[in-house]
Amino acid sequence: MNTFLLSALCLGAWAALVGAVTVQDGDFSFSLESVKKLKDLQEAPESKVQGRRKFVAPPLCSFSGFPEELRPVCKEPNSQDILNRLAVIAQDPSTCEICAYAACAGC
């Protein structure tokens, strides 16, 4: 009985920690899952199209699949810089999962 209880407790703690990795950039904090979605958006065919128009927000912000959690970044004057830093993490999220980046917490 004690073994079962201990196993259930450990499994519950592990499940709680799996989704707990957050990525911080300045005052912003995002789940690692939202940051991982940036990689898919960058590889989308519509992200390769570049026009000569000047955008108020970075082109990624206009994509339909852009994570809602990241939308506040699009309103910042340095949004492209923030998204570029998040994109570095999105390219290799495993390094964030083991806390190799200072921006990652909750591993």
UniProtKB/Swiss-Prot annotation:
Query: What's a Pfam family this protein contains?
Result: Guanylin
Q: Can you list the disulfide-bonded cysteine pairs?
A: 61-74, 96-104, 99-107
In terms of Gene3D superfamilies, this protein maps to:
Guanylin (3.90.1450.10)
Presence of the UniProt keyword Transmembrane in the record: no
Signal sequence span is 1-20
InterPro entries named in the record: Guanylin, Guanylin_sf
Sorted alphabetically, the keyword list is: Disulfide bond, Secreted, Signal
Q: Which residues form the propeptide?
A: 21-92
One Gene Ontology term of the molecular function aspect: guanylate cyclase activator activity
Q: Where, per UniProt, does this protein localize? A: Secreted
What is the superkingdom listed in this entry's lineage?
Eukaryota
**Looking at the UniProt record for this protein, which Gene Ontology cellular component terms does it annotate, in alphabetical order?**
extracellular region
- Asked if the keyword Secreted belongs to this entry, the reply reads yes
Can you tell me which family this protein belongs to?
A: Belongs to the guanylin family.
The record's function comment reads: Endogenous activator of intestinal guanylate cyclase. It stimulates this enzyme through the same receptor binding region as the heat-stable enterotoxins.
Record protein name field: Guanylin
| Source organism (scientific name) | Cavia porcellus (Guinea pig)
